[in-house]
Each structure stands twice: as structure tokens, then as C-alpha cells.
Regions:
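Double-stranded RNA-binding/processing signature
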Residues: 1-188
Length: 188
């Protein structure tokens, strides 16, 4: 797993790099610190943080890819990780309870909360209209961006089992905290 402790040192950076970080995205370095993951392929991070409205205003998908495809993959990665966790840790819970619990853990409201807790909204690249209409705090947009970020980590860390481990490293603490008393019985 590619984890790095992010330093607050700005030595060697120009004043523009202090705010934008090495990816050119405002807050990207802080975001990496918040999730405990440092991207090898910064283009994946950039794509994960790019809303379709920004892409449209900057030449479209071929020139400035947006996060929609990553969102698609991230949704599935998250579902598998949470499903495996519930299946392995709550062996006495019936399927219906596990399904209900997973639905609550990965619903728009929960994902928007996870996204807000890592400061994801502050890092998004939004088109002018989306920016003016409050897109940085819109739950549906935060949810989608969070799923895209998961996919970016998954792909950057090698996909497969390595990718799932990397994503689990920062997703599961939030999920476990939210899990609270949703399921009866104790986890194994």
C-alpha cells in the first residue's frame, strides 16, 4: 500500500504551489494527507476531482476527462469492500440485515458525509455554473466525487486485491464508525 505522511513543510515551493499542491488542484496535497494515500499517477487524482461541468468548459472528455467513469467503478469497489467486511465480521446476521446495513453505509447521505470529512468538496474542479450553484457542498456531487476518488486510489494502487486493501485502509474506519449499532450481534 502506498501511504505517506504528508508534511506541512512548504520548503522549495513557490507561493502558487502552497495552495494548489503538486497536482495543480487546490487542496490536493491536504486531501492526500487526509486519506493517507499519495498518488503515483497524479492524473487519476485530477480526473477523480474533475466534474463534468468543468470538463465541458475546458474542451470535453478527450482533453479534460471528468470523473464519471471513475465514479462508475468506485461505486462497485465500495460495494464489494463494504459487503466483504459485513459478510466476514457479522457471520450471524441474515442476508436482509446485511443488505439493509450496506445500503445505509453506501447511501448518498453517508458518502457525502465521508466526502465532507476529508475536505473533498474544497478540491473539486467545477464549471462556473456548478460553482455558483453551490456544487461543492451538494450531497449528490460529493457522493459521486467520493466514489470517483475510491476508484482512483483502487487503480493507482494496482487494482485487484492491492487496490481493495488501499481503499479499505481509509474507507473502513468511517464505515465502521457509522456502522455503530446497525447490526445486532458483535463483529467477530
Amino acid at each position: 500500500m502506498k501511504k505517506k505522511t504528508v508534511s506541512n513543510s512548504n520548503a522549495g515551493r513557490t507561493s502558487g504551489e502552497n495552495a494548489r499542491g503538486s497536482s495543480g488542484i487546490t487542496g490536493a496535497d491536504a486531501l492526500e494527507g487526509n486519506i493517507g494515500y499519495r498518488f503515483s499517477d497524479r492524473s487519476l487524482l485530477t480526473e477523480a476531482l474533475t466534474h463534468s461541468s468543468y470538463s465541458y468548459e475546458h474542451g470535453g472528455q478527450k482533453i479534460c476527462p471528468c470523473n464519471e467513469r471513475l465514479e462508475f467503478l468506485g461505486d462497485s469497489v465500495l460495494s464489494v469492500i463494504v459487503s466483504e467486511y459485513l459478510f466476514e465480521n457479522y457471520p450471524d446476521s441474515p442476508e436482509g440485515d446485511l443488505t439493509r446495513c450496506r445500503s445505509e453505509l453506501v447511501c448518498e447521505q453517508a458518502l457525502a458525509g465521508y466526502a465532507a470529512s476529508i475536505g473533498l468538496g474544497d478540491c473539486l474542479r467545477l464549471g462556473r455554473g456548478e460553482e455558483k450553484s453551490g456544487g461543492r457542498t451538494r450531497p449528490s456531487l460529493l457522493c459521486d466525487a467520493y466514489e470517483a476518488l475510491l476508484a482512483a486510489v483502487y487503480l493507482d494502487s494496482g487494482a485487484g486485491d492491492a487496490g481493495k486493501r488501499a481503499v479499505s485502509g481509509y474507507v473502513m474506519p468511517s464505515v465502521i464508525e457509522r456502522l455503530g449499532g446497525m447490526l445486532t450481534g458483535r463483529p467477530v
